[in-house]
């Protein structure tokens, strides 16, 4: 019986790309992993290093360096290429440089005949995901950004430390921009199935000091707290990429907060922003529309308006 070989390409083998590749190899997410970088020798070195670690895993992944031409048969192309923000910059400040890089990258990939799924981590990821959708001409369900997947994970981690509950028992999402203007849909955050707002109301003596706005800010600024200490972040986002790729190949139907192009969902059109979505073998099967409160709707709309203002600077 013929079995389809799962193939992934990673474009950009810096710290994020190499961390993603390491996660993919260790988890055995695909059978072939192609690495592409403007510095080809770096991609070759990363491929060699990853190949040498495979004997210490329970997987067998073929890792090699190549070019855009090799993307033709890839199922997923992950793009991590792009400039890192400098001290004092926001992710949005890197837009101009990132957009120029995407024009070259997407053009090269599509010329190969690629017809799979794009998975983006390059910042500002929401706007870059929208740009890649426009440049590629692929259906909107097959162009996905990491969005607020990592932010939602950070939110659960912060809450778990405050509530002393395993983060995997906490469910909830950050929505909107993967950046400073993101918001949390508190009306849908649960701990063991119980609404967190109800828990805080019933247990004021234990949790009366918890400030929800402070948690939102702490979640949004978590990346910068890491940046101040070690210069950049890569493990979290690398694993987020691997997690989404795994969900695609396994057809898991997992709900993950990703950058998705909206066409009427949440009353929004022609914008890419962080929302929960069901991820399948075909990409985004469905965007999950949460019933937001009036205040949450306002915060979500404000975040999207900020994204729109920046989109205009690159012609969208």
Swiss-Prot record:
Residue numbers binding beta-D-fructose 1,6-bisphosphate: 156, 171
Positions of NAD(+) binding: 16, 37, 42, 68, 104, 121-123, 146
Coiled coil: none
This enzyme's EC code(s): 1.1.1.27
GO cellular component, one term: cytoplasm
GO terms, biological process: glycolytic process; lactate metabolic process
Localization in the cell: Cytoplasm
Protein name: L-lactate dehydrogenase 3
Organism of origin: Bacillus anthracis
Taxon lineage: Bacteria, Bacillati, Bacillota, Bacilli, Bacillales
Gene: ldh3
């Amino acid at each position: 019986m013929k079995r389809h070989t799962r193939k992934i390409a990673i474009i950009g083998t810096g710290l994020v790309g190499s961390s993603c590749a390491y996660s993919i190899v260790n988890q055995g997410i695909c059978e072939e992993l192609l690495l592409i970088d403007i510095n080809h020798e770096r991609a070759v070195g990363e491929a060699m290093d990853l190949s040498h670690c495979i004997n210490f895993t329970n997987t067998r992944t073929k890792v090699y360096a190549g070019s855009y031409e090799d993307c033709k048969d890839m199922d997923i192309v992950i793009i991590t290429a792009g400039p890192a923000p400098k001290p004092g910059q926001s992710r949005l400040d890197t837009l101009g440089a990132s957009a120029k890089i995407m024009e070259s990258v997407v053009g090269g990939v599509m010329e190969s005949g690629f017809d799979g799924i794009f998975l983006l981590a390059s910042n500002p990821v929401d706007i870059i995901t929208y740009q890649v959708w426009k440049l590629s001409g692929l259906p909107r369900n097959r162009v996905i950004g990491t969005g607020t997947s990592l932010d939602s994970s950070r939110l659960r981690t912060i809450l778990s430390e405050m509530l002393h509950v395993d983060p995997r028992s906490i469910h909830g999402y950050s929505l909107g921009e993967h950046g400073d203007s993101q918001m949390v849909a508190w009306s849908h955050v649960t701990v063991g199935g119980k609404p967190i707002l109800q828990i805080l109301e019933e247990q004021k003596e234990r949790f009366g000091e918890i400030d929800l706005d402070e948690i939102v800010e702490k979640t949004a600024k978590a990346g910068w707290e890491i940046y101040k200490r070690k210069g950049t972040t890569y493990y979290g986002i690398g694993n987020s990429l691997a997690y989404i790729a795994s969900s695609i190949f396994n057809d898991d139907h997992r709900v993950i907060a990703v950058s998705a192009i909206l066409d009427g969902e949440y009353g929004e059109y022609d914008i890419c922003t962080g929302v929960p979505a069901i991820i399948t073998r075909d990409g985004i099967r469905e965007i999950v529309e949460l019933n937001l409160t009036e205040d949450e709707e306002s915060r979500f709309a404000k975040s999207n308006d900020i994204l729109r203002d920046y989109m205009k600077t690159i012609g969208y």
